Amino acid sequence: MNRVLYPGTFDPITKGHGDLVERASRLFDHVIIAVAASPKKNPLFPLEQRVELAREVTKHLPNVEVIGFSSLLAHFAKEQGANVFLRGLRAVSDFEYEFQLANMNRQLAPDVESLFLTPSERYSFISSTLVREIAALGGDISKFVHPTVADALTERFRK
C-alpha cells in the first residue's frame, strides 16, 4: 500500500495545496497531510486550527488524513508508515530548495521517496504568504482559498 506524506506549514491551506491533495488522492492509496508546527515560522494560525482547516478543505476525500506534527519529518514519516514524500513545485525557484530537502530526507529516511508535482496552471501563482498579505490588507482571497479558510482569515485580521 502506498502511503504518501504531504508535509507543510499550511498557514493557511490554499486551493493550490488542495489541488495537489486531490490529485495525489487519485494516485495513492492513502494521503497524509502532515501539518508542521513550524514555530520558527511564527504561523498566523495555531497548529490545531491549521489542522482543522485542512480537514475541512479535504473532507470530501475519503483516503486523505490530516495530522499535525512537531517532530523531525523523517521520524514522523516512519511513524506513519509513509513511503513517499509529496512536494509541490510552483516555479523553478522552488526547485533548488526542494532538491536540497529531498537529498537530506533521503539521508534521514532512505526508504521514503520524494515525488514532486506541479500545480494546475490556475493555482501555480498562489502561496500562503501572498494569501495572508492580501487578507491582511482587506483584499478578496476567495479565488485562492476555500470559503472556510477565507472566513478564518477574515476573522483573524478583524482582531
UniProtKB/Swiss-Prot annotation:
Enzyme Commission code(s) on record: 2.7.7.3
Alphabetical list of InterPro entries matching this protein: Cyt_trans-like, PPAT, Rossmann-like_a/b/a_fold
SUPFAM superfamilies the record matches: Nucleotidylyl transferase
Bilayer-spanning residue ranges: none
Protein name, as recorded: Phosphopantetheine adenylyltransferase
GO molecular function: ATP binding; pantetheine-phosphate adenylyltransferase activity
Gene3D superfamilies tied to this protein: HUPs
Cellular localization per UniProt: Cytoplasm
Similarity comment text for this entry: Belongs to the bacterial CoaD family.
Role description: Reversibly transfers an adenylyl group from ATP to 4'-phosphopantetheine, yielding dephospho-CoA (dPCoA) and pyrophosphate.
GO CC term (a single one): cytoplasm
Protein residues bound to substrate: T9, K41, L73, R87
Pfam family, one: CTP_transf_like
List of residues binding ATP: T9, F10, H17, G88, L89, R90, E98, Y123, S124, F125, I126, S127, S128, T129
Presence of keyword Nucleus: no
Quaternary structure and partners: Homohexamer.
Catalytic reactions of this protein: (R)-4'-phosphopantetheine + ATP + H(+) = 3'-dephospho-CoA + diphosphate
